[in-house]
Curated annotation (Swiss-Prot):
The lineage of its organism: Eukaryota, Metazoa, Chordata, Craniata, Vertebrata. GO terms for cellular component: plasma membrane. SUPFAM superfamilies: Family A G protein-coupled receptor-like. This is B1 bradykinin receptor. The chain crosses the membrane at residues 42-62, 73-93, 111-131, 151-171, 205-225, 249-269, 293-313. Pfam families: 7tm_1. Coiled coil: none annotated. GO terms for biological process: G protein-coupled receptor signaling pathway; inflammatory response; response to lipopolysaccharide; response to mechanical stimulus. GO terms for molecular function: bradykinin receptor activity; peptide binding. This is a receptor for bradykinin. Could be a factor in chronic pain and inflammation. Its main location: membrane. It comes from Canis lupus familiaris. A lipid is attached at C327 (S-palmitoyl cysteine).
Length: 350
């Protein structure tokens, strides 16, 4: 059975297009019809919220005459990554609304999916860097945290994410898919061989399991070091800035893991079906639909971070208000009644 998911997070490769002697499965038409009708609108809402929210975060963090600290530097890069990511979502929404028939040509097929794939790696690598920075600040407070090192780390993360998305740029193309009545779809045409294993190692191991191990290590040590500290209990009600920053970072990490873990579970399940460790129509349908819905659940993370800023970051709310006052048109100074009276007297005297 061919996959119904031709975009990058949900790849379709050459061996899946027309499998010989494949068993025909009932592919849950009601569930797919619901997906085609509902999810494009949901994606557009996510795109608009993510665009406005991340622009607000960048506007606050990158205000003129203000130097970013190390944590803010990582958070600004995370907002920039999410912003680039949501710019590609309208193409995805149109593709799903069109029942996976790609109408935008080969260049955008590669570009949109490459950006999505790069963001997957850049986001989780930045979460690792953010967790490591909090770990050094709280567990090893005497260690130096230099802005130059943070800038170099951010550049390295963007380069690494871009390099890991190179296979997407190389192997994405427009292909006539029999399961779509030979209409054109944006598919991932992997070369023959052990590519399934290579992709699983890249996506699930480099893109999730290894970063997850680092995130768990850093945050477990952070929680252990904060246990019993009064600033943790006061972090949400005016406690010391260090405690509030830690609460913000931990909320970011928790939201990221909650949003992205289901996708990686279904991506690994797809690998098991591709190598035929897991077989049967139930698992095919479960995997295909699960990948779609888990992907959109992961999309929510790109517009969730600004919400976390507003509700958890008290200092961020203060800076938003300062930015609003700076940008809002200034009202003319109020004129006292005595001044008005003098003006009227001069007017009538003349």
């Amino acid at each position: 059975m061919a996959s119904r998911a031709p975009l990058e997070l949900l790849p379709l490769n050459r061996s899946q297009l027309s499998p010989p002697n494949a068993t025909t499965c009932d592919d849950a038409p009601e569930a797919w019809d619901l997906l085609h009708r509902v999810l494009p609108s949901v994606i557009i809402i996510i795109c608009v919220c993510g665009l406005l929210g991340n622009l607000l975060v960048l506007a606050v963090l990158l205000r003129p005459r203000r130097r970013l600290n190390v944590a803010e530097m990582y958070l600004a890069n995370l907002a920039a990554s999410d912003l680039v990511f949501v710019l590609g979502l309208p193409f995805w929404a149109a593709n799903i609304s069109n029942q996976f028939r790609w109408p935008f040509g080969g260049l955008l097929c590669r570009l949109v999916n490459g950006v999505i794939k790069a963001n997957l790696f850049i986001s989780i690598f930045l979460v690792v860097a953010i967790s490591r920075d909090r770990y050094r600040a709280l567990v090893h407070p005497m260690a130096t945290r230099r802005r130059r090192q943070a800038r170099a780390t951010c550049v390295l993360i963007w380069v690494a994410g871009s390099l890991l998305s190179v296979p997407t740029f190389l192997f994405r193309s427009i292909e006539a898919v029999p399961e779509l009545n030979n209409d054109s779809a944006c598919v991932l045409l992997h070369p023959p061989g052990a590519w399934h294993v290579a992709r699983m190692v890249e996506l699930n191991v480099l893109g999730f399991l290894l970063p997850l191990a680092a995130i768990v290590f850093f945050n477990c040590h952070i929680l252990a070091s904060l246990r019993g500290r009064p600033e943790v209990r006061g972090a949400r009600c005016g406690g010391p800035p260090d405690g509030r920053t830690t609460a913000l970072i931990l909320t970011f990490v928790a939201a990221f893991l909650v949003c992205w873990t289901p996708y990686h579970f279904f991506a690994f399940l797809e690998f098991l079906t591709q190598v035929q460790v897991v077989r049967g129509c139930f698992w095919e349908n479960f995997k295909d639909l699960g990948l779609q819905y888990a992907s959109f659940f992961a999309f929510i993370n790109s517009c969730l971070n600004p919400v976390i800023y507003v509700f958890v970051g008290r200092l961020f709310r203060t800076r938003v208000w300062d930015l609003f006052k700076q940008c809002a048109p200034r009202r003319p100074p109020a004129v006292s009644w005595s001044h008005r009276k003098r003006v009227l007297q001069l007017f009538w005297q003349n």
